[in-house]
Swiss-Prot record:
NAD-binding protein involved in the addition of a carboxymethylaminomethyl (cmnm) group at the wobble position (U34) of certain tRNAs, forming tRNA-cmnm(5)s(2)U34. GO terms for molecular function: flavin adenine dinucleotide binding. The lineage of its organism: Bacteria, Pseudomonadati, Pseudomonadota, Alphaproteobacteria, Hyphomicrobiales. This is tRNA uridine 5-carboxymethylaminomethyl modification enzyme MnmG. It is found in: Cytoplasm. NAD(+) binds at residues 273-287. GO terms for cellular component: cytosol. Keywords: Cytoplasm, FAD, Flavoprotein, NAD, tRNA processing. SMART domains: GIDA_assoc_3 (SM01228). FAD binds at G14, G15, G16, H17, A18, G19.
């Protein structure tokens, strides 16, 4: 783990969720990689809530896992309560989530980093990017040490000129108790990047031994718990329950009487916070007609009495936070371990990036995580793995890879960022994806692992596991389609079918809403030999089969436009474009015609002109070669 060299193929700055995935992915690709972090002991720290996954976010965890990333396996090692959200809804919108033990999670992540071959850890503060002729060539630390690099991935989280706010007080910090990164922001500005400011927040931490648990509703996890990673056979960590309580009218009165002391409302903070994770004072101001707001009481560990009250993020003064807590059922006598706070930090407009997460301004420089304007561990991890594998490819001189909107939520998120930019911290939701039926959490490995194998970021153990699983799934699908039955025979087995004389296969029967795997297995005993995991995949495929056929046509049309590459086009030479459209295209520099179509204000006519121009140029090139 100790650096034995002064130059690396890839240097990753930051040991958070994005940085760990980037560094590990780069090393798996065979690149000599260094992870630069203030202290190795903080690697894998969960700065805010002690949980992984959720709606949309769980899809990202599964996709990171499909590319042999760390978060899924580490989440399984540290998970102390697993739940699949939206379980009553269709598989496309279900979100796997795990409550985590902070210590177990960090320990598992640190172990994974230590065990990654080809990955060194450098403790120190990154201070300045070394740039030569528009390309990053190395990194200078605050203590004067310099390291050369073929590529650099920056994953600084909230540390870029971080500033914590608590009531009327504020002080520089990357998170509570840790210094911010000041020099890197200046380095970005010298390179010509425009920096913006964003804000996020965290709730107070509570002493769980002082909570009246009898006054709150208890919420158990799923039994048995469902792991994130396909490489995890079963969860062996002890499982816990969480509590649920609500704010009251008295809570709201305390907040209204003191809202002027909140940095967000006093004018002390002018940057935007996450719309879908508002502070409790924001909730009361924006949703003043509600009687109460739900609070989840989430234990932070098996041997830690600290509790995270999910739902009351705040930066109000400490004494106000104590008054708020005292007005909430179950928390009347609670002791506050640490007050909540808000933090402001620098970010870069993600439209400065191309879809590989490489900056357009400096070659060899990749960005991932909150520096790109996202919020959340899972969003950071997803960007980290893409940036890390592309940084390794760039360092070796190989072609970079793009994950598009039909590949997965990774592609949806990155395309949203680099095409549309952000005005507030970006969070993933299933509603952001056009191809939700295809991009399910349950089939992430089926969609992405072969791509990861081809790229070189998937190790041999997972490759063998994946191909064995796919052989079993294909064999089960073939068998289920070969077993057929008449309507009369099906009715004798208790199934409700039209008497139309048409034979139907076991696979076709499972497409019916009221027929599942258990019913068809009862008819054909040979299906009993199929592994339950494979059977679940098969049933979901059958339910969605007709819809997936329709969606595949949409994906094919999407891919046609994504195949028309615009990266080298001089828009002044394209006849028929309006000056307004030319200006939009010059500013955005879209990668493909498909991406151009997602720029605000782009017209169908302009897209037709671009597609026709590219086809004409391709024909000219073909004739010239001939």
């Amino acid at each position: 783990m100790r650096p034995e060299r002064e130059s690396f193929d890839v240097i990753v700055i930051g040991g958070g969720h994005a940085g760990c995935e980037a560094a590990a992915a780069s090393a798996r690709m065979g690149a000599a990689t260094a992870l630069v972090t203030h202290r190795f002991s903080t690697v894998g720290a969960m700065s805010c809530n002690p949980a992984i996954g959720g709606l949309g976010k769980g899809h990202l965890v599964r996709e990171v896992d499909a590319l042999d990333g760390l978060m899924g396996r580490v989440g399984d090692a540290g998970g102390i309560q697993f739940r699949v959200l939206n379980r009553r809804k269709g598989p496309a919108v279900r979100g796997p989530r795990a409550q985590a033990d902070r210590k177990l999670y960090a320990a598992a992540m640190q172990a994974a980093i230590r065990e990654t071959e080809g990955l060194s850890v450098i403790e120190g503060e990154a201070d300045e990017l070394i740039v030569v002729e528009g390309r990053v060539t190395g990194l200078r630390l605050a203590d004067g040490r310099e390291f050369g690099a073929g590529s650099i991935v920056v994953t600084t989280g909230t540390f870029l000129r971080g500033l914590i706010h608590l009531g009327e007080k504020n002080w520089p910090a990357g998170r509570v108790g840790e210094a911010p990164a000041m020099g890197l922001s200046s380095s970005f500005e010298r390179a010509g990047f425009t920096l913006g400011r964003l804000k996020t927040g965290t709730p107070p931490r509570l002493d769980g031994t002082t909570i009246d648990w009898s006054a709150v509703e208890m919420q158990p996890g799923d039994e048995p718990p469902e792991p994130f990673s396909v490489m995890t056979d079963r969860i062996t960590t002890p499982q816990i329950q969480c509590g649920i309580t609500r704010t009251t009218a008295a809570t709201h009165e305390v907040i209204r009487a003191n809202v002027h002391r909140s940095p967000m409302y006093s004018g002390q903070i002018k940057s935007s916070g996450p719309r879908y994770c508002p502070s409790i004072e924001d909730k009361i101001v924006r949703f003043g007609d509600r009687d109460g707001h739900q609070i989840f009481l989430e234990p932070e560990g098996l041997d830690d009495s600290t509790v995270y009250p999910n739902g009351i993020s705040t930066s109000l003064p400490e004494e106000v936070q104590l008054a708020i807590l005292a007005s909430i059922p179950g928390l009347e006598r609670v002791k506050m371990v640490r007050p909540g706070y808000a933090i402001e930090y620098d970010h870069i407009d993600p439209r400065e990036l191309d879809p590989t997460l490489q900056t357009k301004r400096l070659r060899g420089l990749f960005l991932a995580g909150q520096i790109n304007g996202t919020t959340g561990y899972e969003e950071a991890a997803g960007q980290g793995i893409v940036a890390g594998l592309n940084a390794a490819l760039a360092a070796s001189g190989a072609a970079l890879t793009v994950f598009d909107r039909a590949d997965g939520y990774l592609g949806v998120m990155i395309d949203d960022l680099v095409t549309r930019g952000i005005s507030e911290p970006y969070r993933m939701f299933t509603s952001r994806a056009e191809y939700r039926l295809t991009l399910r959490a349950d089939n992430a490995d089926q969609r992405l692992t072969e791509k990861g194998i081809a790229l070189g970021c998937v190790r041999s153990a997972r490759t063998l596991h994946h191909r064995t699983k796919m052989e079993a799934l294909n064999a089960a699908r073939t068998l289920s389609k070969s077993l057929t039955i008449t309507p009369n025979e099906a009715i004798k087995h208790g199934l409700s079918l039209n008497r139309d004389g048409q034979r139907r296969s076991a696979f076709e029967l499972m497409a019916y809403p009221d027929i599942g795997w258990s019913q068809v297995r009862a008819i054909w005993l040979e299906l009993s030999a199929i592994d339950p995991v494979i059977a679940t995949h098969l049933e979901i495929d059958a339910k969605y089969d007709v819809y997936l056929e329709r969606q595949s046509a949409d994906v094919e049309a999407f891919r046609r436009d994504e195949g028309l590459v615009l990266s080298e086009v001089d828009y002044q030479l394209v006849p028929g474009l309006s000056n307004e459209v030319r200006a939009k295209l010059e500013k955005a520099r879209p990668f493909t015609v498909g991406q151009a179509g997602r720029i605000d204000g782009m017209t169908p006519a302009a897209l037709g002109i671009l597609a026709a121009y590219l086809r004409r140029e391709a024909r000219k090139t073909s004739k010239a070669i001939a």
